[in-house]
Amino acid sequence: MRIIAELPHPDFKISILNMNQKFIVKIEKGVFEQTYKIPEMDLTDGVNSIFELLDESFLQTVSARFTDMNKDFKDTYFRYNY
């Protein structure tokens, strides 16, 4: 697995990796992680196409999903530990 790029973002860490003819977009926030695998053949402009996919609308959805993940984890944690 090879790191292609790391993109700056104020809320989470975005890494683009390459492995087995796939681009892997890894987005991390705290203990949570979202990973998206995109075959190289599906992209016409290589890694530049990944940059286009990571638009503001997508990143807002990612942020909302992190919020949901945090809530789900806290709910289950408190259900079994308190």
State where each predicted segment sits.
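Short Gly/aromatic-enriched secondary-structure transition segments
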Residues: 38-42
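Mixed-charge, Lys/Arg-enriched low-complexity segments
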Residues: 43-82
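N-terminal acidic leader/helix
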Residues: 2-37
